[in-house]
Design a protein with these regions (language model features):
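Beta-strand-turn-beta hairpins that frame and shape the catalytic cleft
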Residues: 16-26, 137-147, 166-171, 218-220
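Binuclear metal-dependent hydrolase catalytic cores centered on His/Asp/Glu-rich metal-binding motifs
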Residues: 141-198
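N-terminal active-site segment of His-dependent metallophosphoesterases
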Residues: 1-85, 89, 159-168
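Active-site neighborhood of divalent metal-dependent phosphoester/pyrophosphate hydrolases
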Residues: 29-36, 59-79, 100-113, 169-170, ...
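Histidine-centered catalytic micro-motifs
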Residues: 31-33, 173-177, 203-213
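Conserved beta-sheet core of the metallophosphoesterase superfamily
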Residues: 184-221
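Extended active-site neighborhood of metal-dependent phosphoesterases/phosphodiesterases
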Residues: 5-17, 85-153
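Metal-dependent catalytic neighborhoods of phosphoester/phosphodiester hydrolases
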Residues: 36-40, 66-91, 105-125, 214-220
């Protein structure tokens, strides 16, 4: 491990003997392959994300929180090639750390049901990969994780049941918008979420969709 990685781990107390009840997670979203040159994008991700999480002494959960793709692509395209290479590297890292990988569906016009390409990873017995395209809870190392992809036409009653009628949970990962994150709270056909929607969440809410790093209400990232 090089010195820069070691300093980062010390700063965040990422040690092997960290409390076993703490879930160590890595998140990324809105990669939008191939909005930029996909070969260049892959190299940037390898250097700035993949190598860093691979070097972590402990890692329990890796999440791609929506919009891996920018638009519907042909399977023979460079965009699909490099997106798939990126996912393959995530799978390798997941396996080497005995972690879990969650690929969350994002905006329909972007991901366009293309996460199906990675369903085959869920058939493997040697690595834990989950492709999530509907609202549900996932158990990861004794932690209850609420997964909310971007969906349309879901009755509000169903959201209320999941958010308030399903007991406490430890973490929420989602693709969507929290009130105040975008000007005018314009969410199109999606649902606008509010902080009070997550009263049952005992940990952070980590979302993709808005392309600007920010923290809202000290819990929503």
């Amino acid at each position: 491990m090089n010195n820069s990685f070691e300093k980062e781990f010390q700063a965040y107390n990422l040690k092997m003997n960290i409390d076993s009840g703490t879930l160590i997670t890595a998140h990324i979203s809105d990669l939008h392959f191939p909005a930029m040159d996909p070969h260049k994008q892959y190299n940037i991700l390898e250097d700035q994300f993949l190598k860093k999480i691979e070097a972590m002494p402990r890692l329990d959960l890796i999440c791609v929180n929506g919009d891996l793709y920018d638009h519907k692509l042909m399977t023979s395209s460079d965009g699909t090639l490099y997106a798939s290479m990126f996912v393959a590297r995530l799978v390798e890292i997941t396996k080497s750390h005995n972690a879990t990988l969650i690929l969350l569906q994002g905006t329909m016009s972007h991901d366009a049901n293309q996460l199906k390409i990675y369903y085959h990873y869920m058939q493997r017995k040697d690595v834990d990969v989950r492709v999530v395209t509907n609202i549900r809870f996932e158990m990861v190392k004794n932690c209850r994780v609420l997964c909310i992809p971007e969906l349309y036409g879901v009755p509000e009653e169903y959201y209320q049941h999941i958010l308030f009628g399903s007991d406490f949970y430890d973490l929420c990962i989602m693709h969507g918008t929290i009130q105040g994150a975008v000007y005018g709270d314009n969410v199109g056909s999606g649902r606008l979420f509010r902080m009070e929607d997550f009263l049952n969440c005992k940990g952070p809410i980590i979302a993709g969709h808005v392309h600007k790093a920010a923290t809202y209400y000290d819990h929503f990232y």
